């Protein structure tokens, strides 16, 4: 049975979390350890749903900040337990599966919650959510399940998600739409092409329109979001001497959070301008999240991180909070470029930096 010390140095707590292997669908041990540690806090109300653990303070303060992070990882790649190394510049690096995505962020959040879950310590009531199943299908995502079944637990004036962001705020996120554009023809031998109809050729027009598309950039709360429309897949091969009777483009549209899903769909369909006979199939749709940095509760966080913020281009679970009307940002240590890699790693200085900035932001002494 693993014990966690939530009051430990955040680097040591990160290492302890990394050493509890928790690939998706196998989060029970880490959830057990987190639950036990949180239940030791006198003033925390703790609930568990599957392998998702939620703890809250209820001091009757005027505002609430939600701290959320996932506790599952991608499959192991011979990269546990953790290890520490020094870079050529003398920087200490913590290696291990989940070190950057996102057990370091989770360690910072759990540590801040534990230290401030006492009367008079925090400027806001706090909720911490350690959830399962982020790295797999949505139906397993613990935050999605909370949103569906217990949305009141996600309520707050602002939510922070511990995704790796280089120890700066990555505000909001862009929405995403993935569609299939299907063409249907008649198969024939390429030596007798007049006997068939080449489905791939029917996609030439829409392919050229996508290639010519000029994506927009938009500034929201001083964050610049850059949209993108791209073909990310092509299908239709039968044989090297055969006209394909079916061809498909897989298209991804990343849209700024000032567009609703309906507006993004309408814009996408206008740009694609499909010819008769082509079929449009929506495969995946997810709304974006506005940055919310104009929210008064966010001002203290912006100050605590020295005004360092930028737009989040990818989609993250902050959108789940945004859909409930809760402004949300990504804030965690480390370079997301190391996520999911065998050499996953996180600088220890960034872990301590995020931990200190969180405490500065959330502490009653900072008011």
Predicted regions and their residues:
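Acidic-glycine-rich active-site phosphate/pyrophosphate-binding loop
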Residues: 72-90, 156, 171-182, 329
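A structural signal for isolated positions on well-ordered beta-strands in alpha/beta enzyme cores
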Residues: 66, 127-129, 279
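Acidic/His- and Gly-rich active-site-bordering loop/insert found
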Residues: 2-99, 115-123
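Buried hydrophobic packing segments
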Residues: 34, 106-116, 146, 203-206, ...
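Acidic/histidine-rich catalytic neighborhood of metal-dependent amide-processing enzymes
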Residues: 107-175, 366
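Conserved strand-to-helix beginnings and helix N-cap segments that scaffold or border functional pockets
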Residues: 28, 79, 106, 139-144, ...
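Metal-dependent amide/peptide-bond hydrolase catalytic core
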Residues: 2-5, 164, 171-172, 178-367
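Glycine/serine-rich anion-binding loops at beta->alpha junctions
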Residues: 93-108, 189
